Swiss-Prot record:
InterPro entries from the UniProt entry: ATP_synth_F1_dsu/esu, ATP_synth_F1_dsu/esu_N, ATP_synth_F1_esu_C, ATPsynth_dsu/esu_N
Known partners and oligomeric status: F-type ATPases have 2 components, CF(1) - the catalytic core - and CF(0) - the membrane proton channel. CF(1) has five subunits: alpha(3), beta(3), gamma(1), delta(1), epsilon(1). CF(0) has three main subunits: a, b and c.
Species whose genome carries this gene: Nephroselmis olivacea
Molecular functions (GO terms): ATP binding; proton-transporting ATP synthase activity, rotational mechanism
Chain's role: Produces ATP from ADP in the presence of a proton gradient across the membrane.
Keyword terms of this UniProt record: ATP synthesis, CF(1), Chloroplast, Hydrogen ion transport, Ion transport, Membrane, Plastid, Thylakoid, Transport
Annotated gene: atpE
Keyword Chloroplast: yes
Protein name: ATP synthase epsilon chain, chloroplastic
Length: 133
């Protein structure tokens, strides 16, 4: 038996696959989900998600949302999602370094909040672009 994993964004069904294991970025840290997991609802943070089907891992960036786990089904509603294989690693690194510098040079509280969000988004894109090849 496997997990049925669906990732939904406002624009589309981003992913609909069977998986043996997933690792979710929750607000309290990374959480692994295997078959027959106890039912739960959890907040999804900006972070990398990993999906294992047989012996193959697939990485993706999730940009905040909710996940529901019940009866070997995982439904994830997120603002945005992007496959690691679709991200240009060099471009992601450049964006990450620029976001890191912008965060360090934030002058106002508003700039700090906006730059922190941009930094988290850039960091996760860079992580998943280089995580699993």
């Amino acid at each position: 038996m496997s997990l049925q994993v669906r990732i939904l964004t406002p624009e589309q069904v981003f992913l609909n696959v069977s998986a043996d294991e997933i690792i979710l970025p929750t607000n309290t840290g990374q959480m692994g989900v295997l078959t027959n997991h106890t039912p739960l609802i959890t907040a999804i943070d900006i972070g990398p998600m990993l999906v294992r089907s047989e012996s193959t891992w697939q990485s993706m960036a999730l940009l905040g949302g909710l996940a529901l786990v019940k009866d070997n089904q995982v439904i994830i509603l997120v603002n945005e999602a992007e496959l690691g294989s679709d991200i240009n690693a060099e471009e992601a690194e450049t964006t990450f370094l620029a976001a890191k510098e912008a965060l360090a040079n934030s002058k106002t509280r508003k700039d700090q909040i906006e730059n922190n969000l941009a930094f988290k988004r850039a960091r996760v894109r860079y992580q998943v672009a280089t995580l699993v090849k």
